[in-house]
């Protein structure tokens, strides 16, 4: 037997062989079986707070399908090792958008791949969680090395050091988006 959602009173009574009766009542028992689904999306797949005006912050949108009975919420920035580096939290009211500047709880940048983990706590006991797609926090510029051979070179068609060989070596902990020479 399944009871419909609603507010109930639980009453227990007993009578012994001598006819003595007692009754205990618990009021306002809330039965709520409605699902509590939550979602989080990252506004970008990269965060590079370097001061150049590109990808300085990352925004997160949260969706909660049910606000009734919401006690608290939490949005954690979790690194590739599963360690929470930054936490945003609150009671009941969830902002439509949460902005992260890339700094951990100590005000430092810890580079790497992250996910946002969103969780909520309801009075009825539900604890739904959701994760965003991953994104990269990168504040270190690529390492670039240029080498020339011969130095000096003399393009005078005398057959000695007329051609210049240029070698490039570019490395980064993340992928190189583009380059030009």
Task: Describe the role of every protein-language-model region.
Residues 1-181:
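Short loop/turn motifs at secondary-structure boundaries
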């Amino acid at each position: 037997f399944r009871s419909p959602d609603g507010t109930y009173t639980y009453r227990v009574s007993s009578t012994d062989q001598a006819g003595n009766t007692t009754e205990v009542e618990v009021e306002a028992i809330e039965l709520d079986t409605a699902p509590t689904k939550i979602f989080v999306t990252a506004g970008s797949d990269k965060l590079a707070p370097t001061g150049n005006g590109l990808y300085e912050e990352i925004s997160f949108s949260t969706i909660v399908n049910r606000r009734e009975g919401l006690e608290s919420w939490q949005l954690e920035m979790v690194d590739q090792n599963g360690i929470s580096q930054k936490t945003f939290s609150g009671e009941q009211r969830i902002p439509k958008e949460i902005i992260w500047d890339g700094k951990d709880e100590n005000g430092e940048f810890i580079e790497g791949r992250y996910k946002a983990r969103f969780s909520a706590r309801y009075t009825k006991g539900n604890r739904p969680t959701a994760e965003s797609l991953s994104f990269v926090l990168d504040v270190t510029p690529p390492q670039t090395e240029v080498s020339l051979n011969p130095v000096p070179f003399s393009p005078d068609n005398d057959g000695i050091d007329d051609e210049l060989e240029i070698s490039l070596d570019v490395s980064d902990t993340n992928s190189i988006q583009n380059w030009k020479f």
